[in-house]
């Protein structure tokens, strides 16, 4: 067997372990960061904090690093599979030992298991990436709604549901991390057992080599050809040197694997510490959620109390509104009655003014009547005088004749003219010619019908 074969076989089985261990460590750290990110997301949901864009960019960088490392591990694993297949073909062509083929088959199966584990880790990475994208999307939605979000009745229930969901998710992540750690412990135990078995097989191969080296002189004696013996000796010496080199390589590999095991144990302890920190964080988060729920309960009770007070105030306000409406209707009625009263007062004042005007007109008419009666008395008196003068003149005319009538005419010219002016009409006719009219409707009445005029004025002023 060549000097590379055991080393390549060991590397084909354990070569991708450091990168897988690193990827698993990065994945665990990534899970812790996602848990912290979800914790901060729950704090944002409860109004306790905000996640900066810097943390989000860090998480995205972590995802990219994990993706690159996963692709690198997949490529490395494919190369190892090709190397295993090549070694398998080489061993089949050189050796017909069934034990080596069985070992190679076992190593191939273990490599397949390792590949399946790597695929499961890659799937888990994809799932975590999807969860992170969904969480980022939800965070952006929450940040967009955070500026317009107000306290309402559904806020306590939503906060409670979101906090319970976040607690459940954290518990599931914690259980998943514990299961993964347990799987890695079992895997490390199996790897250690495999290394021990491999060392035992290496020692057995050394013994076989030594036995073959011890039996070589006897075989050399039995052989007839010196050239064949020399060739076989060189062959076995070469195999012995290769076996020693492979043994040294395997010892170095075992030392390296032990160092990796110690490193993995250290990382496992760190993971356990992170799990404890997560438990403490979860307990503190639960306490904070309980406190927040109590605060929400107090707020709900306060809101209910304020609503009851608001309903009482609304009832009082409705009663006051009804009273104000009643008072307003009464005020309107009083205002209408006041307007009617003012109208009545204005009508009364108008009637009083009209009565005063009528009274004044009546007094004026009374004065006019008195003046007319006085004038009538004067006219009648003058008429009597004129009649007496006419009678005297007629008697004188009859007595003295026509010769004496010419002398008194110039002396009695003015009374004669007056008699001529008044003789065609009687005093009653002169009185009837003076007219008196109503002050309101201007209806004219003769002065002799002054009583009818008074009756008309009283009727017209009503």
Swiss-Prot record:
A single BP term in Gene Ontology: regulation of phosphatidylinositol 3-kinase/protein kinase B signal transduction
Classification via InterPro entries: CEP55, EABR
Its biological purpose: Plays a role in mitotic exit and cytokinesis. Recruits PDCD6IP and TSG101 to midbody during cytokinesis. Required for successful completion of cytokinesis. Not required for microtubule nucleation. Plays a role in the development of the brain and kidney.
Post-translational modification summary for this protein: There is a hierachy of phosphorylation, where both Ser-423 and Ser-426 are phosphorylated at the onset of mitosis, prior to Ser-434. Phosphorylation at Ser-423 and Ser-426 is required for dissociation from the centrosome at the G2/M boundary. Phosphorylation at the 3 sites, Ser-423, Ser-426 and Ser-434, is required for protein function at the final stages of cell division to complete cytokinesis successfully.
Phosphoserine carried by residues: 96, 99, 423, 426, 434
Superkingdom as given in the UniProt entry: Eukaryota
One Pfam family named in its UniProt record: EABR
Transmembrane feature ranges: none
Keywords: Cell cycle, Cell division, Coiled coil, Cytoplasm, Cytoskeleton, Mitosis, Phosphoprotein
Subunit record text: Homodimer. Interacts (phosphorylated on Ser-423 and Ser-426) with PLK1; the interaction is indirect via the MTMR3:MTMR4 heterooligomer, occurs during early mitosis, regulates the phosphorylation of CEP55 by PLK1 and its recruitment to the midbody where it can mediate cell abscission. Interacts with AKAP9/CG-NAP; the interaction occurs in interphase and is lost upon mitotic entry. Interacts with PCNT/Kendrin; the interaction occurs in interphase and is lost upon mitotic entry.
Name of the protein in its database record: Centrosomal protein of 55 kDa
Positions of region (Required for localization to the interphase centrosome and to the midbody during cytokinesis): 354-462
Region annotation Interaction with PDCD6IP: where it falls in the sequence: 160-214
GO cellular component, one term: centrosome
Region (Disordered): 1-25
Listed Gene3D superfamilies: Geminin coiled-coil domain, Nemo cc2-lz domain - 1d5 darpin complex
Modified residues (Phosphothreonine): 428
Compositionally biased residues, Low complexity: 12-23
Keyword Plastid: no
Record organism: Rattus norvegicus
Basic and acidic residues composition-biased segments: 1-11
GO molecular function, one term: identical protein binding
